[in-house]
Swiss-Prot record:
Protein residues bound to Zn(2+): 602, 605, 615, 618
Activity regulation (record text): Single-strand (ss)DNA regions and DNA single-stranded binding protein stimulate relaxation.
GO biological process annotation, one example: DNA repair
GO MF annotation terms: DNA binding; DNA topoisomerase type I (single strand cut, ATP-independent) activity; metal ion binding
Native organism: Saccharolobus solfataricus (strain ATCC 35092 / DSM 1617 / JCM 11322 / P2) (Sulfolobus solfataricus)
PANTHER family, per database record: DNA TOPOISOMERASE 1, PROKARYOTIC DNA TOPOISOMERASE
Active-site residues, as the UniProt record annotates them: 318 (o-(5'-phospho-dna)-tyrosine intermediate)
Cofactors: Mg(2+)
Temperature-related behavior of activity: Optimum temperature is 75 degrees Celsius for topoisomerase activity. Optimum temperature for decatenase is 75-90 degrees Celsius.
Name this polypeptide is given: DNA topoisomerase 3
Disulfide bond sites: 4-34
């Protein structure tokens, strides 16, 4: 008898094969393993002898496909394997679900409980099954208890999430396909050359932010400022104090220092403070990506992928969450009990010692209605490869740190007053009284200072000092992690999409890795410049952030999907009108960028000349440099050549500026 030959069952659709297996094993002690089209699926019976077939998808099985031409507004959902050759592997999953849907009594979407999971399951059931017979399973971890609870509490389809997801797909498709085709058509009509180019609703403002930042760095000229350091002899101590005052002119700093030398100082106040250093809340995805990047240098995209693997292995809760909270419905004690039976036993013993066995989660500010903060499930990890272990260890330690206790620090602060002079300054040292969570989540360091013992009324003398010159610094280059933080602060994308968007920009050769930093390529530079110049609305962060807010409102049922899509089409029409006016200029700019037509190059780089034999950036650098030299002269009293040498030798000086300075020095 073929046990896989069944009918009259309910079809449960999981997002991935690992998830399908976990669901089957949670719902039955002996699930029947079957294979068809080279894909595994499982059959189970419940206590009422109802049959269930658990089948995996492979993520999205459907994608949007529109007509050729420009502009395009309409698209239909088509099987991915038909419209994308790189997704041909999804055909066997499509065939399996299609064949199993024919004999199903009903359908259960058990894909990840987020916007994408809701859309994946909805489209599969709508196109291959019967959406009128569909239900939803919602869980935050692939543990037996979570899956059983979700199975017992099956609900109606989450249409607000589905509508928000479909709106996001349609809007991203509308902007991506039309802006990309506009760029390619402009180039093809002008230079008779077809080149694949792309732009998008979220990726374009992100690219422009990196490019604008890089331009400002290349144009940066450090300016001098001055501070004063003094050496104070008091009791047996020789204290090196940096006075908290800045001077624009060196003469002012020297005059200030001369007045201080040999002055008496007196301790006028001693303050002892004990403060708590609060333990951290559990991770949301962005926090995890930032910490993994800071500690291990792992890219946000890879952090997300590794976390998803750990989730599918049943080791952590669902990672694509914005929440920093763990609700009371989740048993902290059971999780800790599970970790006690793993390699984390010593750490659990330490947490128990710190808390006396009473565990209270440090709840964060951010929340997510769909999922709690990322936390270990309590299942013991076994033989994890190094990359997985690093992420799991971060999550486990962060969770245990969040249920331990705040650290306790003491700060001793001495206020010293200079006699016959309007200046007070402080000297302090920090001591750790109780480490608590710092011993659990040991990735956070607190520096203890060498103690200083002074009393009120103690006197000393300023015996020496010096004037320090410091140069202003440009903003730091973006790393993948800092760019992710900028995207979050600008409300661009979601916690589930930001890391992937950064990787897309690298894959399309708009950005490239430069050590731990990312910088624009020549192509990325030109694309950003063209979008900035001709289509500023597309790269306006406010427009994209506003759209993200509207999509969130769909998810909470506050606005209709159709209204948001209509609004985007109106904005797209405005873009198309602007494009028609600038089409030839866009084509010419792209042709120049790709080297398809000859240009008169800047004497310092490959960009087109703008004025005086210079591109517009080197010309701007020259103008800024002339102004900066005058500021240097006023502040330092240096001669012209010395100023140029100081600017040239500074690591902060931008590339465009250095090119101009080098030429000026060679001409003197």
């Amino acid at each position: 008898m073929n046990l896989c030959n069944v009918n009259n069952y309910y079809l449960i659709i999981a997002e991935k094969s690992k998830a399908a297996k976990k669901i089957a094993e949670a719902l039955s002690e002996k699930p029947i393993l079957c294979r068809k089209y080279n894909v595994s699926y499982w059959i189970i019976k419940d206590h009422n002898s109802s049959k269930y077939v658990i089948v995996p998808a492979a993520g999205h099985l459907f994608g949007l496909k529109g007509e050729s031409g420009f502009p395009v507004y309409d698209a239909d959902w088509k099987p991915l394997w038909e419209i994308d050759k790189n997704s041909y592997y999804t055909k066997r999953y499509y065939q399996l679900i299609s064949s199993l849907s024919k004999y199903a009594l009903g359908f259960i979407n058990a894909c990840d409980y987020d916007i994408e999971g809701s859309v994946i399951g909805y489209l599969i059931i709508k196109n291959l099954g019967d959406i009128k017979k569909a239900k939803r399973m919602k869980f935050s971890a692939l543990t037996k208890s979570d899956i059983l609870s979700a199975f017992r509490n099956i609900s109606a389809l989450d249409y607000d999430m589905i509508n928000a997801g479909i709106a996001r797909h349609k809007i991203d498709w509308l902007w991506g396909i039309n802006v990309s085709r506009a760029l390619m058509i402009s180039l093809q009509d002008f230079a008779k050359k077809r080149v694949i180019l792309s732009a998008g609703r979220v990726q374009s403002p992100t690219l422009v932010q990196v490019v604008n930042s890089e331009i400002e760095r290349n144009l940066f000229i450090p300016l001098p400022k001055f501070t004063v350091s003094i050496i104070v002899k008091i009791k047996d101590y020789s204290l090196n104090i940096k006075v908290n005052k800045e001077f624009e002119k060196i003469t002012e700093a020297k005059e200030f220092l001369n007045k201080l030398i040999n002055k008496t100082v007196k301790v006028v106040e001693v303050e002892n403070r004990v403060r708590l250093l609060e333990r951290p809340s559990p991770f949301n995805l962005t926090d995890l990506q930032i910490e993994a990047g800071r500690i291990y240098g792992i890219s946000p995209y890879n952090v997300e992928r590794i976390a998803e693997d750990l989730y599918l292995d049943g080791l952590i809760s669902y990672p694509r969450t914005n929440s920093q909270k763990i609700p009371s419905t989740i048993s902290i004690y059971n999780i800790i009990k599970g970790l006690e039976n793993s390699s984390y036993r010593k750490l659990v013993d330490l947490v128990r010692k710190i808390t006396g066995g009473k565990y209270v989660v440090k709840q964060g500010i951010k929340d997510d209605p769909a999922h709690p903060a990322i936390h270990p499930t309590g299942e013991a990890p076994k033989n994890l490869p190094n990359s997985k272990f690093k992420i799991y260890d971060l999550i486990a330690r962060r969770f245990l740190g969040s249920v331990s206790a705040d650290a306790k620090l003491s700060n001793t602060i001495y206020t010293l007053k200079v006699s016959d002079f309007p200046l007070e300054f402080t000297v302090s040292y920090t001591k750790i009284l109780e480490r608590n969570w710092l011993d659990i989540y040991h990735f956070h360091n607190v520096k203890e200072d060498k103690p200083i013992f002074l009393s009120k009324g103690d006197e000393g003398k300023i015996v020496d000092g010096k004037v320090n010159i410091s140069l202003s610094k440009p903003t730091s280059r973006y790393t993948k992690v800092s760019l992710l933080k900028w995207m979050e602060s600008s409300n661009l994308g979601t916690e589930a999409t930001r890391g992937r968007i950064i990787e897309i920009l690298v894959k399309r050769k708009y950005l490239t890795n430069n050590g731990r930093y990312i910088i624009p390529t020549k192509l990325g530079f030109y694309i950003a410049e063209i979008l900035n110049k001709f289509f500023p609305d597309i790269v306006d962060v406010r427009m994209t952030a506003d759209m993200e807010s509207k999509l969130e409102m769909i998810k909470t049922g506050k606005v209709l999907e159709s209204k948001v899509i209509k609004e985007n089409i109106e904005k797209l029409n405005k873009f198309i009108e602007e494009y028609k006016v600038n089409k030839d200029k866009v084509g010419e700019s792209l042709a120049k960028a790709l080297g398809l037509i000859k240009i008169v190059k800047c004497k310092y780089c490959d960009l087109e000349q703008y004025k005086d034999g210079l591109c517009k950036y080197h010309y701007e650098a020259k103008v800024r440099l002339l102004d900066a030299v005058e500021i240097w002269k006023e502040r330092t009293k240096y001669d012209h050549k010395k100023i140029l040498k100081r600017i040239s030798s500074s690591k902060s000086t931008g590339k465009y500026v250095k090119d101009i300075v080098t030429y000026m020095l060679s001409s003197e």
